[in-house]
Amino acid sequence: VVPAAKPVGSFTAAQVEAAYQTSRKLLVAGNLNKVALLGGPPTAFANLLNSQERAQFLGSLNTKGVSKDGSPLSTRVEVTSFAPGSAELVGNVIKVRGTMSAKSAAFAGTTVLAISVNYLFAYAVESPGSPADWTRVVAHQYGSFDFAQWSDPGGPLQPWDDTGGDHAGALCGSTDGYLRPDYPSESASAPGPTPSGPFMNPYSNASAGGSAACAQTTHV
């Protein structure tokens, strides 16, 4: 459920309402779309972006490697997507908790309608072919969708995705943007960095370490 829309700065209540609805669609397409979740193309998410960002998103979707801070270069990190063949959803319920709000802000030299979001998505997943081997993965998306007339001056407001995220219950060290669940049977021999640093509560909306972080979690 999105908040009741009110005028914000120079933006009308109708523009705020439209931005809320588009932000909701982006959250759903990026975190609840079954095709993208199970490693397929995130088409629904890409179609909601403005044309400039869509081209960037699709152009780097299959890029492999990491940046200097260790975060994947692939734009697939902008959605929640398990590596093909690494997970099956347990049941039909994905738990969601979060908030969104609107404000006028400056972004890239432009006055934008910023829809701030802070959401947690909790998935129960099992190893394909081994239903007894299951775990939970928690995705945390935060930041803002910034609305302006990015590629169509005089047209409707369009979103620019300026959000980030954390994940718990997935292996660290992804080089392709996909998530790989940290199943109990594989934890001891799992590849990738070992979680370190302060413990993080994955169910807290305040936990925001960034996509390159490999923090220890209290539980999943």
Model-derived regions, located:
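Core segments of small alpha/beta cavity-forming domains
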Residues: 1-78
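Phenylalanine-focused residue identity feature
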Residues: 11, 20, 45, 57, ...
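Residue-identity detector for threonine
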Residues: 12, 22, 43, 63, ...
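Generic structural hydrophobic/aromatic packing signal, biased to beta-strands
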Residues: 45, 100, 115, 143-145
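Extended interaction regions within the primary functional domain
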Residues: 51, 58-70, 86-91, 174-195
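Extended amphipathic alpha-helical segments with heptad-repeat/coiled-coil character used for oligomerization
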Residues: 56-136
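Extracytoplasmic/luminal low-complexity segments enriched in Pro/Gly and acidic/polar residues
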Residues: 118-220
